[in-house]
Amino acid sequence: MITFIGYKFLTFLAYITPYPVTYFIARVGAILIYALGIHARVLKKNISLATGMEPECREVKKIVRDIYYQWFINVADFLKHPLVKADKFKKRIEITGVENLSNALKKNKGAVIFTAHLGNFEWGACRLAVEGFKVWGTGLTRKSVKTMLFFEKRRLLKGLKTLYVNKMMLNIFRILKNNEVIAIPADFDPLGTAKLHKFFGHDAFIPSGPVEIAMKSGAPLLPSFIWRKDKYNHVQVVEEPVDLIAETSDTPDRHEIINLNMQKMVSVMEKYISRHLEQWEMFHDIWSK
């Protein structure tokens, strides 16, 4: 209940302040959290392993500081989300490659989109929804039903439906059979069931869900990533489907095929994350050591 009340208060604050003031408050909050060192160790480790730089070097600290700011203004955008009309929303997110998703859906097997905790990834899924695609984004169940509905209703304002990760296998293939789209951040496994895969040259627990779902269902697996271009605007790209190695009846080792396809997915994530490290909002330790 306390968490829900906190979100409602922050929403009220976001509603009564113009964007420049809201972003200023977000910047102050980011500076405070950075000064307190909350999540700092994990963020430094993530950036260090992704770049090869020492965790305490000046450049890593600068990137971590920028991540805090990006995180806070993305939260501000989330709180103001109901105030942004669909036409304005489209203008704020410049998207390319929509035709790749349209063409993928011509197979009538749905589509699996993978992304990362990069930029305002929630808005990335919403941007596809306002284009007219039927999109489901994965989400976490929360202890407070009110808090859970708070997040869910905001997504629905732009047509994005929520698929809760602890219930997804019950519905996921039905969604794909209906030729709809599932969007999954693939750089973190909230269920803790992921196996180790090479990520930026290091062992990390990367979920194979997007790959395995695509392989089993026959749905195309497409990358889509979003990043902030300037203070108020974003760029989003939808790439062509990943050329997955198909599993056949005489496949000698299914796990080897999955691993090879995982390498393809991971390499795309690495490409976009490395280009926009200051927007990689990964607050979890995903590494084996």
PLM region descriptions:
Residues 1-115, 151-153:
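Membrane-anchoring hydrophobic helices of lipid-metabolizing enzymes
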Residues 5, 39, 93, 164, ...:
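Soluble or luminal CAZymes and related metallo-dependent hydrolases
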Residues 9, 43, 124, 150-151, ...:
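Hydrophobic alpha-helical segments typical of transmembrane helices
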Residues 40, 141-145, 203-207:
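Active-site metal-coordination segments of metallo-dependent hydrolases
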Residues 53, 62-65, 103-106, 130, ...:
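Non-catalytic C-terminal accessory region of glycerolipid acyltransferases
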Residues 88-93, 140, 157-163, 200-201, ...:
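Short, flexible loop segments at the rims of nucleotide/cofactor-binding pockets, characterized by
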Residues 107-166, 189-195:
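Catalytic core of membrane glycerolipid acyltransferases/transacylases, capturing the structured
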